[in-house]
């Protein structure tokens, strides 16, 4: 679709109000976090972890936590960008009824979005697979820092190499010299970020909340997502079954491109600048 027509179509949806935004990794690239399918993304640097590996493969789990100890620092320092703040403005103006994000970086929350569902969780929390205890990631990081003095500073890190799930590729000798901390409650090292990994279902409470948001919306705008993961693609399918228009704003090809009402192939940040200007926000 021609850019002017796509912009006009998205603006009309927003002017009518009650729009549900669905966001993906492309929203956070301007914050310095590569998406999964970029040249530096994890699907090109090696596959992401699975739930089964966290639960049953101590070597893979140890490797992840060594890599994540380094990569999470970059994620924690990342700041919301203009797209995150644009979505906050649209929500405060009463044009967005809610946001469903597939991202686990917590940047929508930190930007101030209120009616928000983090479909795949948030890296800011960890969970013990042994006893179920949850705690803030920063508390685990403090224990890891105590057990691994000087570890982070000894590694030359390219921030652009950090994956959306918070880890970064490390040489084996760095992985081997890393010491893992245990659960604050039971001491088990069976820890996992409280996010949905491959082989793990989206919690039913989040599915229910997404269904409620979609039921109350008149349209859906997808931003920065190829919708390759079924949990995001399903929202588009359900919206269209209900006769609700769907727009996609994304820089690359996506799974739902052939079926949406408005397809705007462009960078997400500049697109939302144009949207806010058109709405006088």
From Swiss-Prot:
EC category name: transferase
UniProt KW Magnesium keyword: no
EC number from the UniProt entry: 2.3.1.286
Binding site for NAD(+): 24-44, 102-105, 224-226, 250-252, 268
CDD domains (alphabetical): SIRT4
Keywords noted in UniProt: Cytoplasm, Metal-binding, NAD, Transferase, Zinc
Disulfide topology: none
Reaction(s) the record says it catalyses: N(6)-acetyl-L-lysyl-[protein] + NAD(+) + H2O = 2''-O-acetyl-ADP-D-ribose + nicotinamide + L-lysyl-[protein]
Entry's Gene Ontology cellular component terms: cytoplasm
Manner of cofactor binding, per the entry note: Binds 1 zinc ion per subunit.
GO molecular function: histone deacetylase activity, NAD-dependent; NAD+ binding; zinc ion binding
Cofactor requirement: Zn(2+)
Active-site residue list: 120 (proton acceptor)
InterPro entries linked: DHS-like_NAD/FAD-binding_dom (IPR029035), NAD-dep_sirtuin_deacylases (IPR050134), Sirtuin (IPR003000), Sirtuin_cat_small_dom_sf (IPR026591), Sirtuin_class_II (IPR026587), Ssirtuin_cat_dom (IPR026590)
Superkingdom in the source lineage: Bacteria
Binding-site residues, Zn(2+): 128, 131, 183, 186
Ranges for domain Deacetylase sirtuin-type: 1-281
SUPFAM superfamilies: DHS-like NAD/FAD-binding domain (SSF52467)
Compartment list: Cytoplasm
Family: Belongs to the sirtuin family. Class II subfamily.
Cross-referenced PANTHER family: NAD-DEPENDENT PROTEIN DEACYLASE SIRTUIN-5, MITOCHONDRIAL-RELATED (PTHR11085:SF10)
Function: NAD-dependent protein deacetylase which modulates the activities of several enzymes which are inactive in their acetylated form.
Protein's UniProt name: NAD-dependent protein deacetylase 1
Source organism of the structure: Corynebacterium efficiens (strain DSM 44549 / YS-314 / AJ 12310 / JCM 11189 / NBRC 100395)
Gene name as annotated: cobB1
């Amino acid at each position: 679709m021609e850019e002017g027509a796509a912009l006009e179509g998205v603006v009309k949806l927003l002017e009518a109000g009650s729009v549900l935004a669905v966001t993906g990794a492309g929203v956070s690239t301007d914050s310095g976090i590569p998406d999964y399918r970029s040249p530096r993304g994890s699907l090109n640097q090696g596959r992401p972890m699975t739930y089964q590996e966290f639960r049953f493969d101590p070597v893979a789990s140890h490797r992840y936590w060594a890599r994540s100890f380094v990569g999470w620092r970059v994620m924690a320092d990342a700041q919301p960008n203009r797209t995150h703040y644009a979505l906050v403005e649209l929500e405060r103006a009463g044009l967005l009824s809610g946001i469903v994000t597939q991202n686990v970086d917590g940047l929508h929350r930190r930007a101030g979005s209120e009616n928000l569902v983090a479909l795949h969780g948030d890296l800011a929390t960890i969970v013990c697979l042994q006893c179920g205890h949850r705690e803030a990631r920063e508390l685990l990081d403090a224990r890891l820092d105590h057990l691994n003095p000087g570890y982070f500073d000894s590694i030359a890190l390219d921030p652009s190499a950090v994956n959306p799930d918070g880890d970064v590729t490390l040489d084996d000798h760095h992985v081997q010299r890393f010491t893992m901390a245990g659960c604050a409650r039971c001491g088990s090292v069976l820890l996992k970020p409280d996010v949905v990994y491959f082989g793990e279902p989206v919690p039913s409470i989040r599915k229910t909340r997404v269904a409620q948001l979609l039921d109350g919306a008149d349209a859906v705008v997808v931003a920065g997502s190829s919708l390759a993961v079924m949990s995001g693609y399903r929202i588009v399918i359900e919206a269209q079954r209900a006769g609700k228009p769907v727009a996609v704003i994304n820089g690359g090809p996506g799974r739902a491109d052939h079926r949406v009402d408005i397809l705007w192939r462009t960078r997400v940040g500049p697109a939302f600048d144009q949207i806010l200007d058109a709405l006088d926000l």
